[in-house]
Amino acid sequence: MSSTEMKSYLSLIPISAKVRRRQNRMTILCIVLAVFLVTAVFSMADMAIRMETSNQLNKNGNWHIMVKDISPETAAELAAQEDVAAFSAYSDINASLTENYFAGDKRAALVGADDAILQIFPGMQCSTAPADGEVLVTANIRDWLDVTVGTAIPLTLPDGQTISLTVAGFNEDTSDANQYDAVVLVMNRSTFSQIAAQVEESFETQYFIQFKPRTNLRQSIVNIENKYGISEEKISENTYLMALNASSNNDYIVGLYAVAAVLAGMVVLAGIFMITGSINSNVAQRTSYYGMLRCLGAGKNQVRMLVRLEALFWCKTAVPAGCVLGIVSTWGLCSFLRGFIGEEFSSLPVLGISPVGIICGSALGLITVWFAASSPARRAAKASPITAATGNAVENAADSPCHARLFGSRAELSLGVSHATSSKKNLLLMTGSFALSILLFLSFSVLLRWVGFALNPVQSYAPDLSVAETSGQNVLDPVLVEQLEALPEVKHAFGRMYCPLPAEYQGKQGSIDLISYDTIQFGWAKKDLIGGTLPQEPEDGTYPVLTVFDKSNSLTVGDTIQLEDAKLTVVGVLNDSPFSSTDSPIVICTEETFHQLTGQNRYAVIDIQLKDTTADAAIAQIHTLLSDTLNKQVVFSNRIEGNRMIQSTYWAFHLVVYAFLIVIAGITILNIVNSISMSVSARMKQYGILRAIGMDDAQLKRMISAEAGTYAVSGLVVGIALGLVLNRRLYILLITHYFGAAWQVPWGCLAVIVVVVLAAVVLAVYNPVRRILMQPITATISEL
């Protein structure tokens, strides 16, 4: 381009970009990586939300709240609300499967609902709502009956009567029904009421409400409470769906919102620090170039605009490349999860495009680059014309006296530290960049621990099959356990006894849920101890017991529990157990202690673990054995599919988090390498002078190593200090408050962090030193 064609100094931008293609490569790479990181994280989060929304709609239904204990008149008014899209009454009989309702040979739960139930539960496949005498039935009924739409099925009632119902459609969500080896029959309220009247069964009516799209869900709920005087206790939320809509007021979900916001903020900050540090170093290399422009008559404002637009010029390729890389990586991860992990991810979009991810990534790139270039632009504008003659200025080149005293005769080490600390802003950016990477690493590592607590089926005590007598009493003969253990397909069989007892503890009257463990269960419980020890033999007339941590359970090691004629002492606290939390503390004792306290020695439930969970014939054999032995008065639970899905989710979650941690580690290494390389390039002339006056190759290596080491140490100190604080806070919020496990210093993570940073420093030093040593001293001195 000739001088007559150049309309302004801005015309130099594409020329400079072409000439300095190699020098700009690392800066562009930093922008690409930052945009990629944000795009991938937010895109994957968007895909996960879409998947979970679809899963929850099919599994739990498309309803937002459920209201109970209201009059029919209030229900009619609620259904007519402008913001209500669907409204259905809902009643059920035998939801616990403890009564003798049978569809064929399988236990049945009955549901009565309005026509809108089809809209609220999209998994129900039926063109029209069931008419009188018709039912929607869970699709698992086809596993043992030849049933199609229009087929009549027999429903046996507890009084022995049998009525015939016609199948109008199927509910494809069979996870709960399969787990309990049962079927669910959904019918209109007229048919349901007739059956209830026939067997003189009482029932409660609840009401599902689905709000219209773009409704302020929280405000609508508050309006209903205020207008109709309905208390919060009478309104239940669809927690998952409300959470996915960012509308839940559940304390735990709100806490997860805060955690997600903090982690997302750190991801964005990591990108900002990376881009800012890179641009800062890039401009520092070219001080003499800007001084030359000042010699040619460019004003300070022109130089400032030149630097900013030059930075945006890099975004022309870097931002699209980062977005594309983020989208492709999201596609790859989604494809892997959907194709190789399991059915849980079958609704995950494979080739989905996330506007949220693209907008966040692009905005981060453009906005950060613009603002990140502001300070370097001001520095470039201050470059005096004389800089063009003297070359790139070296800030505070003189060694600090404290550095000299620290390293004594090792002048090269003092110089290296001085180079790192001479620019306070550059040191801050480098330290901040490393520290944020460490913060992210320590923060996301908490999620790996959290998922281990949250997903119970991955625990060693998780059963594949369970059986309980329909009354829920301790009536299962221990001989059954011996018979099951003798089967070659069974890995473990174990039972538990249960008894609620009135008790006095911590100065108050209440009750406890007493549960027995055998030897193998105590062996599994040992790893879940968060305080105390396992119970041994009774001493001094008191029985040692365990309790399970829960927010509502204040029992701790050393507390005593006074029963009517016995005294218990809590000797240990578990952070996890197979039991659902109740209002009463869970207390665990040995089978011998249970027998002495209650006089009972039969089990309430028997759990079975199989050697091969795919052996359908073995499962059928066990099912037949238990049903025949107990005369079918049992609730048989098959948890294999549910365990498999949650196990897949567990490993998939680990895969995603580990992949993200690897990306963080990779970006940290590249950032350190890039920053050191650009810092060395900015001082290339100074290094040439030092070599000319006698600095040998070994001293040069030590000097650059000292500079890189200073950045690494400052980043490690700040990152680990802040990271441990955040790690502890997240751990307490996500785990300690809900599972009771105490926080411990994550020494393993800290070791990985130190190794990664040290490896990055070694890599960062190698290339710049090699580049300097390969150049003649005269070429180094004359380089701009």
Task: Write out the residue ranges for each language-model feature.
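A cross-kingdom feature of multi-pass membrane systems that activates on extracytoplasmic/periplasmic
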Residues: 201-202, 210-258, 620-650
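Hydrophobic, regular-secondary-structure patches
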Residues: 30-105, 443-511
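Short helix-loop junctions at transmembrane helix boundaries
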Residues: 48, 252, 323-360, 646-653, ...
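Feature of multi-pass inner-membrane transport and sensor proteins
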Residues: 1-26, 285-302, 329-359, 367-452, ...
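Interfacial "coupling" helices/loops that link adjacent transmembrane helices in transporter permeases
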Residues: 20, 271-315, 668-710
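Short beta-strand boundary microenvironments
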Residues: 96-152, 166-175, 192, 199, ...
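Selective transmembrane-helix segments that form parts of the transport pathway or gating/packing helices
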Residues: 307-324, 397-403, 704-718
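N-terminal membrane-entry
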Residues: 250-267, 356, 647-664
